[in-house]
Amino acid sequence: MVESADGNTLYVAAYEFFVSIDVSDKDNPIQNYSVGTGGLYSWDIVLSSDEQTAFLASGSYVKIYDISDPLQAVLITDFVSSGDNDDDGTTDGTARSLRISADGNTLYVANGGEGTRIIDISDVSSPQLMGYVTSDNFVFGLAMSADGTMIYSSSSGELQTINVTDPQNPELIRAIPSVRDSWRL
């Protein structure tokens, strides 16, 4: 869930939906819209800095929506965030957690069994995979350093520190075993 900068709208990744709620009257929240995800679970949502675009982690996709109309979200594109690495005919990753760079041009995706994906979103209608860091475990959560140079990923067995100063060539700085499954950072 993410709140608009003015505090009047909540955007929610809700089970198999993406929901916008007007909370300008805190005693009487009103649903603006609800968009189905085609049966895919929605795990996380982030907004562009101008709050005109929403990025939704949903199944093996990052769904990108134009949210400039407060009463309607329009799907711009579905970016397949994963591939078929084992050639079994199915996608291997599951987009779970998202972070966006301060300049709004790069999206970081905790992508389940495929590790951490780095996506160029400078053109939201045509996102491109820039780089990635694999993991032997299922990556659930992401956090970003205050200066935007490091991504921290959590998985079902380790915590990773990734230098993303050059997003096309991310560098795994450290991986340490986690005591328990760390779902979110």
Language-model-detected regions and their locations in the chain:
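Feature marking well-ordered beta-strand scaffolds used for ligand recognition
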Residues: 1-185
